[in-house]
């Protein structure tokens, strides 16, 4: 009961469903864990449902530069529509250098939303002196990320974890829903389609292949 949040009947259930994980984790990582301020520079690495919500959170907070990073050009295009000021394809060998060039040395905050060691490495290399890496993606439990202790000392970098966006559901979900209603958090643009039980396996395949952001499972659909 501590994590059950009542929503009123005016909010469509299909819209409400996305707030339970993707919105909390992405927006929360930016607003709660990092607590970015207006004028900060941000890189969102990994543009699934969580990463794109992180981008929306950065826009809401007034970040000066929001750099969207992914290997999928379609997702980079969507990121621009949602408010990214710059996009970088992580397939480019010089993608870290591109991020540094955009920000004259590195971002204040780099958010790892992809759940991979490679994305974490991109984040670490892309932050400026005194910058922070916020890891919100869940890599496989056997994954290891290595860094140079002298480098993290002399550069005063920080690496932090963010579990479910450091959210308290009964506090944060109503707040995010209200922002959505005010048109400040366009989470509905992340929903590709509704599917029925017969499409579940295909839906998971599309999610794995990066062909969709979020799908809503509606049992009555045949």
Regions picked out by a protein language model, each given a short descriptive name:
Residues 131-134, 147-189:
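Rossmann-fold dehydrogenase core element
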Residues 43, 67, 132-134, 160, ...:
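Structural detector of well-ordered beta-strand residues that form the stable sheet scaffold
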Residues 2-3, 8-93, 97-98:
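Mid-domain Rossmann-like dinucleotide-binding core that forms the NAD(H)/NADP(H) cofactor-binding site
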Residues 109, 121-125, 170-222:
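C-terminal hydrophobic helical "lid"/dimerization subdomain
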Residues 4, 87, 159-161, 190, ...:
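Conserved beta-strand scaffold positions in the cores of enzyme catalytic domains, especially
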Residues 34-37, 50, 71, 77-158, ...:
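Glycine-rich cofactor phosphate-binding loops and adjacent beta1-alpha1 units
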Residues 25, 54, 75, 95, ...:
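Hydrophobic alpha-helical segments typical of transmembrane helices
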């Amino acid at each position: 009961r501590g994590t059950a949040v009542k929503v009123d009947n005016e909010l469509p259930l299909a819209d409400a469903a996305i707030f339970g994980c993707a919105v909390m984790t992405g927006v929360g990582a930016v607003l709660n864990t990092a607590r970015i301020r207006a004028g900060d520079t941000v890189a969102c690495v990994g543009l699934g449902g969580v990463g794109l919500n992180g981008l929306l959170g950065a826009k809401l907070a007034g970040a000066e530069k929001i750099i969207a990073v992914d290997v999928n050009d379609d997702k980079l295009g969507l990121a621009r529509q949602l408010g990214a000021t710059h996009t970088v394809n992580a397939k480019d060998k010089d993608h870290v250098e591109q991020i540094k060039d955009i920000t004259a040395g590195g971002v204040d905050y780099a958010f790892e939303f992809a759940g991979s060691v490679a994305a974490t490495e991109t984040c670490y290399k892309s932050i400026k002196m005194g910058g922070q890496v916020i890891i919100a993606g869940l890599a496989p439990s056997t994954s290891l990320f290595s860094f140079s202790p002298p480098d993290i000392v002399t550069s005063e970098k920080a690496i932090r974890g963010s579990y479910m966006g450091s959210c308290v559901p009964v506090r944060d979900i109503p707040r995010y829903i209200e922002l959505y209603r005010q048109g400040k958090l366009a989470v509905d643009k992340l929903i590709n389609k509704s599917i029925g039980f017969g499409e579940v396996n295909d839906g998971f395949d599309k999610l794995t292949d990066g062909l969709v952001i979020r799908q809503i499972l509606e049992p009555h659909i045949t």
